[in-house]
Amino acid sequence: MGNSASRSDFEWVYTDQPHTQRRKEILAKYPAIKALMRPDPRLKWAVLVLVLVQMLACWLVRGLAWRWLLFWAYAFGGCVNHSLTLAIHDISHNAAFGTGRAARNRWLAVFANLPVGVPYAASFKKYHVDHHRYLGGDGLDVDVPTRLEGWFFCTPARKLLWLVLQPFFYSLRPLCVHPKAVTRMEVLNTLVQLAADLAIFALWGLKPVVYLLASSFLGLGLHPISGHFVAEHYMFLKGHETYSYYGPLNWITFNVGYHVEHHDFPSIPGYNLPLVRKIAPEYYDHLPQHHSWVKVLWDFVFEDSLGPYARVKRVYRLAKDGL
């Protein structure tokens, strides 16, 4: 392993994303999979429990020493808040109440956003649609790092820093790559979040607010669960741009590890994704997969072939009216 990543550009391809064709083939062969495209009634209750757990944690940490507050923010709060962000991910696909009740899904996402400390649920939904429709799309898929990230974060130390700062890159990258007009829902999301933060501060003081913010920053940064950010689409093997992970961390992440299955069928809630693989194993079992998100992070930092540039990119031709 050298001191600098060996890649100097993204992996440019001139083919369509593989998920579209695989989806057609699987549905033609196994039409019963359509029955999995239904709302998950468990999702709203899981969100309620996670939010209440963090509110209880806010009350418990109000008198803790700062060092212990930060410890629990990483060890416990980071897991809960990261789980909530993945609930928001599922909700962005209308998994809680179905496409016919979009408003209920949006407000559940805003509610799930409360322990995260900063408003982002409405913005996430706005951009996540493009991630699926234009996977790896130049100037469209804001999940792909910028050229500046690829150029600068090219050594083990810098890649480690990049992982620590993931929450900032995911928040700021859309504004640079594909800025969009602010929506009414984003404004409401912000107002509700600010009101919640102020209420927590008024009730229990500064420490619970810091606990929630630290839980988000630490839990979405250099954290075992954050391995999924890298595991999902970074090119560990040439020719493959999406990878699944079938390990135990799926239990607390709404099966986000079933990522190939998710991109094949975005309308299937995370709870049902294991059934997709069970019904159509010949489409998934032979694909390369990850077995440890921690190992993913280790390899990303120390393997020369990996870094922010290790992403597949393609150019999409859009209609004149844009998105």
Curated annotation (Swiss-Prot):
Motif Histidine box-3 mapped to chain: 259-263
Q: Where is this motif: Histidine box-2?
A: 128-132
Keyword Transmembrane helix in record: yes
Motif Histidine box-1 location, chain numbering: 89-93
Q: Which Pfam families would you find in this protein's record? A: FA_desaturase, Lipid_DES
Swiss-Prot/TrEMBL keywords: Endoplasmic reticulum, Lipid biosynthesis, Lipid metabolism, Lipoprotein, Membrane, Myristate, Oxidoreductase, Transmembrane, Transmembrane helix
Lipid bilayer topology: Multi-pass membrane protein
Which positions carry the signal peptide feature in this UniProt record?
none
The places in or outside the cell where this protein is found are: Endoplasmic reticulum membrane
Q: Lipidation (N-myristoyl glycine) at which residues? A: 2
Pathway annotation from the record: Membrane lipid metabolism; sphingolipid biosynthesis
Q: Which InterPro entries match?
A: DES1/DES2, FA_desaturase_dom, Sphingolipid_d4-desaturase_N
Question: How is this protein annotated for GO cellular component?
Answer: endoplasmic reticulum membrane
What chemistry does it catalyse, as a reaction equation?
Answer: a dihydroceramide + 2 Fe(II)-[cytochrome b5] + O2 + 2 H(+) = a phytoceramide + 2 Fe(III)-[cytochrome b5] + H2O; an N-acylsphinganine + 2 Fe(II)-[cytochrome b5] + O2 + 2 H(+) = an N-acylsphing-4-enine + 2 Fe(III)-[cytochrome b5] + 2 H2O; N-octanoylsphinganine + 2 Fe(II)-[cytochrome b5] + O2 + 2 H(+) = N-octanoyl-4-hydroxysphinganine + 2 Fe(III)-[cytochrome b5] + H2O; an N-acylsphinganine + 2 Fe(II)-[cytochrome b5] + O2 + 2 H(+) = an N-acyl-(4R)-4-hydroxysphinganine + 2 Fe(III)-[cytochrome b5] + H2O
Kindly state the tissue distribution recorded for this protein: Highly expressed in skin, intestine and kidney.
- The source's domain of life comes to Eukaryota
Its biological purpose is as follows:
Bifunctional enzyme which acts both as a sphingolipid delta(4)-desaturase and a sphingolipid C4-monooxygenase.
- Mind telling me what this protein is named? Sphingolipid delta(4)-desaturase/C4-monooxygenase DES2
Q: What is the lineage of its organism?
A: Eukaryota, Metazoa, Chordata, Craniata, Vertebrata
